[in-house]
Amino acid sequence: GIDTDSFIAVTDTKYEGFVPGEIKTAAVPADMVEGINIMDNSTVTLVLYDKDVNGNHKDFAHVVGDFNNWTLSNDEKSQMYRDDASGCWWITLAGLDAGKEYAFQYYVGTKEGEVIHLADAYTEKILDPDNDKDISASTYNENLVYPKGGVGIVSTFKIQKDSYNWKYNDFKIANPEQLVIYELHLRDFTASSDINGAMGKLSYLKAMGVNAIELMPVQEFDGNDSWGYNPCFFFAMDKAYGTKAMYKQFIDACHEAGMAVILDVVYNHATGNNPLAKLYWDGDKTAKNNPYFNVEAPHPYSVFHDFNHESPLVRKFVKRNLQFLLKEYKVDGFRFDLTKGFTQTSCTESTASNYDA
């Protein structure tokens, strides 16, 4: 398996000479969550959590994107407010087009010269300057144009999300204790290596007596060619297999055929392209002050960057992600990868399977 990060090399000259202004403070508007908040048909509030294990935060946070022509400024178009009570930076963007997809990223850092170009961890779609160009139009027939102002991976949002009319809103597994599960990797299952190909083989699976399909990880992972155990954006489905609508069509078709859909999910670790890792980084690993990750895994199954599963922030993130997948995609269950890594107790190969209360 892959166990090294696949970083996108970038050279940042676009914002040379920009001097961030003094921090402006204001309380985060009521009922906001971290990430992208749709307020109305023309307004979005972006919320970025930034409070390390020592209670400190970055010295500045701005946002750049299609909505401000990728231009940094110390005003309401780019500079984020700071709310120490919540530990968040935030900004409300007005005058947006409800039907337009906007690309954006955060620009955060310190007075000592640290600058981080950060996508939103909660985005449902990323644009990747290195890998999107290799995805065929037959697999992904929606916008993949990378913005000229971006630096590395960028996130997106759209106020008026594309609707999908589910045929099966309340699918129930007929015999949950008698599942015949087929573990399916979309890349390897058919010649087209995507959802379109898998859709054409559902009758084959049904004829074999399969009543549940377990999709190997489909949340956005580094690159396009992987088993998926190198996740980076947990709320975005990987575009190498298809669009959001195609994923929903596949799940709907499975339900129509009487087959449940189980997602293989990876919450033991994330790659360095994950924004929660990238925000607090040191050399080639997560920094000691990162509130989401361990510097080194306490267990012997270390791959990529190990989540601190006792962190309230991690538990909140995982719970929110699972709820999102259930509601947005109507999946029927989950297979949790590498659960022996869900620990903060130091262990070895011989003790890793011990009960950990």
Task: Annotate each predicted stretch with a short phrase.
Residues G1-I2, V108-T110, Q219:
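Surface-exposed loop/turn motifs at beta-strand-loop junctions within extracellular Ig-like
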